[in-house]
From Swiss-Prot:
Membrane spanning stretches: none
Name the record gives this protein: Homeobox protein LOX10
Top-rank lineage group of the source organism: Eukaryota
GO terms under biological process: cell differentiation
Location of this chain's protein in the cell: Nucleus
Function: May play a role in patterning the gut.
Organism name: Helobdella triserialis (Leech)
Length: 184
């Protein structure tokens, strides 16, 4: 009964949409939608040698059906850059002084520490996001903020000289003048 209803709806669908050909393979049926211009070669992800790419117009029955997941059209991601401790030290030192850099300042810092201006720009963007996120998390859970800041400070380069100091002498430590001006 269900099959006869389905078959009836299929016949009705074909009568109302005579240009739909459901018996064609997906490549021929949708070739014009996915490939407005014929592609002759593609580069597999792990090769610099082009391989023949099936042309939508010239598909024959001996070829395997087209599987879009087997072809990668996206660009490769660049490798992740690992900064040296000296570079991180300078980036963090400058970030504490200034959260945003102008293009000339960015270029000067990049030249000074041996990075590209784009790398410096991205590092500053990421660091602003991280500090904003950590401040938001510390507002939501004040009891865990002291543990979070102490564990993250131990992972940072030169954290003992640049982390906020909590002391009994009223904050008169040598490096506390910069930190007292910032909202906590």
């Amino acid at each position: 009964k269900i099959v006869s209803r389905w078959m009836g709806s299929q016949n009705n669908h074909q009568q109302t949409h005579p240009n739909h050909h459901h018996h064609l393979p997906p490549l021929q049926h949708h070739a014009n939608n996915y490939f407005p211009m014929p592609l002759s070669t593609y580069y597999p992800p792990d090769s610099s040698v082009p391989l023949p790419f099936p042309s939508p117009a010239g598909v024959n029955s001996t070829q395997a059906p087209f599987n879009p997941s087997q072809f990668c059209f996206s660009h490769r991601r660049k490798r992740r850059i690992l900064f040296s401790q000296a570079q991180i030290y300078e980036l963090e030192r400058r970030f504490r002084q200034q959260k945003y850099l102008s293009a000339p300042e960015r270029e000067h810092l990049a030249t000074f520490i041996g990075l590209t201006p784009t790398q410096v720009k991205i590092w500053f963007q990421n660091h602003r996001y991280k500090t904003k996120k950590s401040k938001k998390e510390s507002k939501n859970s004040p009891s865990s903020s002291s543990m979070t800041s102490s564990s993250s400070a131990s992972n940072k380069v030169a954290s003992t000289t640049h982390s906020p100091k909590v002391s009994s002498n009223g904050g008169n430590g040598s490096n506390t003048t910069n930190n007292n001006n910032k909202p906590g």
